[in-house]
Amino acid sequence: MQAWVIGNWKQNPATSHDVDALLNELCTAISTTKQLSHNNSTRCQIMVAPSFLHLAAVSSRLKDTSVLCAAQDVSAYSASVGAYTGDCSAQQIADVGATWTILGHSERRQYHQESNDTLLQKMTHALTQELGVVFCIGETQAQYDAKQTLPVIDSQLAVVKKLIAEQPEVIDSLSTRLIIAYEPVWAIGTGKVPTVSEVSATHQYIKQTLAGFADSLSNMTVLYGGSVNADNADSFAADPMIHGALVGGASLKAESFLAIVTAFSKGSM
């Protein structure tokens, strides 16, 4: 299975100059790294998700490369246009060249109180505009301590289950247009990292749950996110249940980001 490594830049970098510098560093490093050459790019798909403000510029810069560009969110209220101050629609995102979007990140759930109903609307709009969706799920520290990881995952994956129930016509496309990113909230940016065996078992549960929704979802891509870095990427990449990584802070430096990409490129061989 092809691996995926996705850099979620969040609200970074601060300036267009810094974005250009990061892109130049990233593209130069990719072109000079044998394992990341065009001939080997099918082993690991690289994608970056800049802020809305930089999305068009980054998408344009990456147009003739193997690196994909994603948004970090889409509007829940309209797939196209409307009086929704501050929102960007899926159509607008697709129009500037992005082909994917992240949805359901824990920071969006926490700071913007995003519910399952909201996420269902966003996912519907994204798929309507032919955007792929990286759907983030994961438990908090309190839920982990209470051994509620699997029930929490069930409740969050209910968005996918409801999507299929309400729009069965999308089922066949989800195997290539939906990626699940398991990000335990307590591990994001904290330096705390679950064991590889814990992540592997959780990924197996996610895959089994999705397969229960529809036979065509039996081989879904499931990524891990949460303090993934150059030092621990090899151990995650070696596990067949872990198909890649959603990377936060480590994606803001080309060297550390590409070390993770290289690890998963080797792991998918």
From Swiss-Prot:
Which Gene Ontology BP annotations are present? Answer: gluconeogenesis; glyceraldehyde-3-phosphate biosynthetic process; glycerol catabolic process; glycolytic process
Keyword Isomerase recorded:
yes
Q: Which reaction does it catalyse?
A: D-glyceraldehyde 3-phosphate = dihydroxyacetone phosphate
Q: Tell me the HAMAP family matching this sequence.
A: TIM_B
The entry's family comment says: Belongs to the triosephosphate isomerase family.
Q: What does this protein do?
A: Involved in the gluconeogenesis. Catalyzes stereospecifically the conversion of dihydroxyacetone phosphate (DHAP) to D-glyceraldehyde-3-phosphate (G3P).
What is this protein's record name?
Triosephosphate isomerase
- Organism listed in the record: Psychrobacter arcticus (strain DSM 17307 / VKM B-2377 / 273-4)
Q: Top-down, what is the taxonomic lineage of the species of origin?
A: Bacteria, Pseudomonadati, Pseudomonadota, Gammaproteobacteria, Moraxellales
Q: Gene that codes for this?
A: tpiA
